[in-house]
Amino acid sequence: MSITKEFDTITAISTPLGEGAIGIVRLSGTDALAIAQSVFKGKSLEQVASHTINYGHIIDPKTGTIIDEVMVSVMLAPKTFTRENVVEINTHGGIAVTNEILQLLIRQGARMAEPGEFTKRAFLNGRVDLTQAEAVMDIIRAKTDKAMTIAVKQLDGSLSQLINDTRQEILNTLAQVEVNIDYPEYDDVEEMTTALLREKTQEFQSLLENLLRTAKRGKILREGLSTAIIGRPNVGKSSLLNNLLREDKAIVTDIAGTTRDVIEEYVNIKGVPLKLVDTAGIRETDDLVEQIGVERSKKALQEADLVLLVLNASEKLTDQDRALLNLSQDSNRIILLNKTDLEQKIELEQLPDDYIPISVLTNQNINLIEDRINQLFFDNAGLVEQDATYLSNARHISLIEKAVQSLEAVNDGLALGMPVDLLQVDLTRTWEILGEITGDAAPDELITQLFSQFCLGK
């Protein structure tokens, strides 16, 4: 996908393929109205007012056959998402009808849009910057209301504003350094001393480091916590999974070894998306299929952000239990003593003090798991502060870290007594790195790669 501006007219189906109440086929470009009009029987789309919805029929211009009864939205440039003429054909939902209309539009001169091309045009035409474009996809992929809140704030420009303001301050500082170098005789320009440059770079660094502190929370809310449910066979792992999901997605029986693979599900725990991984019971076994499941379970444990270790409170600790306690001790772990509704035989004195007694059968203390997750990952603070700007995108986090390193290089140079003018390089690099976040200084290959991750029709 080229990153140069293109003025051909593109089209794509913007709703998921399948049966539904409506389907939407979108057009964007200079000829959007003319192409839509060529297959539309109703009002003249080229004469109706912008941002209106118009009733009519889609017809095959060759045969005159009616394809569907539709409502057509007309939006004229520049007051559209792409800042081009946009037409959206609202059809009855269905694979056949939307595909037929799409093919008609292509035959009439539109080009099939590439993934993310509508949003790419919005970026190229200055409607959104790169962080806002990425926020569009984050909204689509948000699994909880908290993740959606962060994405909407980013789409609204909160992160862009912070980055742009910081870049402007850095640019002002660079300009002041340049004036001092080129025109040292000017008395009305504040001298950029070593002390003043140190003060400014420390101010920039502090701001970016504060932003980085939001990254852990933001990334969790955006991507979720990979959560491994581990334990020896038949201690209630799958029952716990089903309890958290509130539906029967895993096989639950009284036969040890019935979970022979890794089952993954997402669940919303107080606004935090947990990617729950129900692992096969980790034990020695001669069953080849079960052995594969056990190996996958060990891998899931190593990669997990959170480990829920389930023990059977109605039985004494086994060697397998002790092995799992040792295996998971360096993880963010919550120990769950299940089956507390039965007579307890487990040796509590051999366990860490932070276990939670639960009964999946009676739902006892399941809510405490949510509280412990909040304690482990958010220090019991609220998940999202309404006025805060959060980093949640791995690309943004990496670039902010690089920008901080560049500022540290400036401060290190100042500490070594380097002349102010020699430190311009690192300060300029900081300015360029921040520009990659918003797209002002992003390489063409990066922009192409980012938009290729979008879905068709967006």
Swiss-Prot record:
This protein's GO CC annotations: cytosol
UniProt xrefs under SUPFAM superfamilies: P-loop containing nucleoside triphosphate hydrolases (SSF52540), TrmE connector domain (SSF116878)
InterPro entries: G_TrmE, GTP-bd, GTP-bd_TrmE_N, GTPase_MnmE, MnmE_dom2, MnmE_helical, P-loop_NTPase, Small_GTP-bd
EC number(s) on file: 3.6.-.-
Gene3D superfamilies for this protein: P-loop containing nucleotide triphosphate hydrolases, Probable tRNA modification gtpase trme, domain 1, tRNA modification GTPase MnmE domain 2
Residue span, TrmE-type G domain: 224-378
PROSITE patterns assigned to the protein according to its UniProt record, in alphabetical order: G_TRME (PS51709)
Nucleotide-binding among keywords: yes
Compartment annotation: Cytoplasm
Stored Pfam families: MMR_HSR1, MnmE_helical, TrmE_N
Alphabetical keyword list: Cytoplasm, GTP-binding, Hydrolase, Magnesium, Metal-binding, Nucleotide-binding, Potassium, tRNA processing
Swiss-Prot/TrEMBL cofactor(s): K(+)
Record text on cofactor binding: Binds 1 potassium ion per subunit.
Residues holding (6S)-5-formyl-5,6,7,8-tetrahydrofolate: R26, E88, R127, K458
BP GO annotations: tRNA methylation; tRNA wobble uridine modification
Subunit: Homodimer. Heterotetramer of two MnmE and two MnmG subunits.
PANTHER family, alphabetized: TRNA MODIFICATION GTPASE GTPBP3, TRNA MODIFICATION GTPASE GTPBP3, MITOCHONDRIAL
The protein, known as: tRNA modification GTPase MnmE
Organism: Streptococcus pyogenes serotype M5 (strain Manfredo)
Gene: mnmE
